[in-house]
Regions:
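Conserved nucleotide-binding/hydrolysis micro-motifs of P-loop NTPases
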Residues: 74-77, 88, 116-119, 164-167
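AAA+/P-loop NTPase substrate/partner-engagement loops
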Residues: 63-93, 100
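Conserved alpha-helical scaffold flanking the Walker A/P-loop in AAA+ ATPase domains
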Residues: 88-112, 145-151
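Walker A/P-loop
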Residues: 36-73, 102-103
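Conserved catalytic/switch belt of AAA+ P-loop NTPases
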Residues: 112-153, 158
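The Walker A (P-loop) glycine that initiates the GxxxxGKT/S ATP-binding motif of P-loop NTPases
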Residues: 47, 84, 115
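Short loop/turn elements that form and flank the Walker-type P-loop nucleotide-binding site
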Residues: 38-41, 64, 83, 104-109, ...
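Pre-Walker A (pre-P-loop) alpha-helix and adjacent loop at the N terminus of AAA/AAA+ ATPase modules
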Residues: 2-46
Length: 167
């Protein structure tokens, strides 16, 4: 992966958006220069609906040669959907992160946290927000899925959140 290749993919798939593309390419170039493309700080893309945030996340994944999946936070109202449910419960299963990591076959996906701004509108979003903070922390090596009950290393995952409104 080179900056030129990334730039070509982003330019080919997104007309305009120059400041956003330049910012991402700046981040990529610093990470490549430091050989740290895996340790990527979480990023927030915000703007009105329909400007291309979701497709831009897909293009970033393509430019980095990574698989991607989306978590629709706007409709998420149960923390167990993120964190999984203990195996001792009936119909227990891993959380959405682990299910998708398993489905994609990689611990290095681009994870799209869609509509992160909608969390505040959920009646009991505080537990979900706490789980997200834990996942997005700089030390992402100890994410606990309740179903597996072992620490999961998410340090190679890239988290990109999108929001329509950040106020």
């Amino acid at each position: 992966t080179t900056i030129q290749n990334m730039s070509e993919i982003l330019d080919e798939e997104h007309y305009g958006m120059f400041s956003v593309k330049d910012r991402f390419l700046d981040i990529f170039s610093r990470m490549l220069h430091n050989n740290q493309i895996s340790s990527f700080a979480p990023i927030l893309l915000h703007g009105p609906p329909g400007v291309g945030k979701t497709s831009f996340v897909s293009s970033v994944a393509k430019a980095l040669h990574r698989k991607t999946f989306k978590i629709a936070l706007g409709g998420l109202d149960d923390e167990l959907e993120l964190k999984g449910c203990s195996i001792s419960y009936n119909k227990a299963q891993p959380g959405i992160i682990i299910r998708n990591v398993e489905r994609l076959g990689t611990f290095s996906p681009v994870i799209h946290l869609d509509e992160i701004d909608k969390l505040g509108k959920i009646s009991d979003a505080s537990n979900i927000e706490g789980i997200l903070l834990d996942m997005l922390d700089n030390d992402r090596t100890n994410f606990m899925d309740l179903y597996l009950d072992i620490p999961i290393d998410l340090s190679n995952a890239i988290f990109i959140a999108t929001a329509n409104n950040i106020e």
